């Protein structure tokens, strides 16, 4: 299987995991209820996020849809163009694409994004699997850029 096909399968599997977790939460946890998952570390709750990160820009679903489509198109184009470059770059973009599309599916099908993870040890926003993909993907891209910068300075 070509590298592009492998990346596409990974993106689909990641989206599937995100949607599976969201579906479980919607089916098993009443809206707003908090359940301890890993005591003193992580709780599960069911939150309908109609905004962006930290619930900003509430009820602007078409704005988010357009932005997501533009960013995803750019990320997919860049990934396609640089597929043979850095494994870090491919990994980071794969996570970003899966995370963006996972939340996009929620916005288009329900009008909100399902969030569920609450960190008990810090005051932090409730987030979901797709948000985790996006966050880790951005960190991996930053590492890829730093590695490229360091390697570029050696030449």
Predicted features along the sequence, with ranges:
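Alpha-helical transmembrane bundles and membrane-interface segments of multipass inner-membrane proteins
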Residues: 1-155
């Amino acid at each position: 299987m070509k590298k592009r096909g492998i990346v596409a399968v990974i993106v689909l599997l990641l989206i599937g995991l995100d949607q599976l977790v969201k579906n479980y939460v919607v089916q098993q946890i009443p809206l707003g209820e908090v359940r301890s998952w890993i005591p003193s570390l992580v709780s599960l709750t069911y939150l309908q996020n109609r905004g962006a990160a930290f619930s900003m820009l509430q009820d602007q679903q078409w704005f988010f849809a357009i932005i997501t489509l533009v960013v995803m198109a750019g990320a997919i184009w860049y990934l396609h163009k640089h597929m043979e470059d850095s494994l870090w770059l491919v990994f980071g973009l794969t996570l970003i694409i899966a995370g963006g599309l996972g939340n996009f599916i929620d916005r288009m099908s329900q009008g909100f994004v399902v969030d569920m993870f609450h960190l008990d040890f810090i005051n932090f926003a409730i987030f979901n699997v797709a948000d985790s993909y996006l966050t880790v993907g951005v960190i991996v891209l930053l590492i890829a850029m730093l590695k490229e910068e360091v390697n570029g300075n050696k030449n």
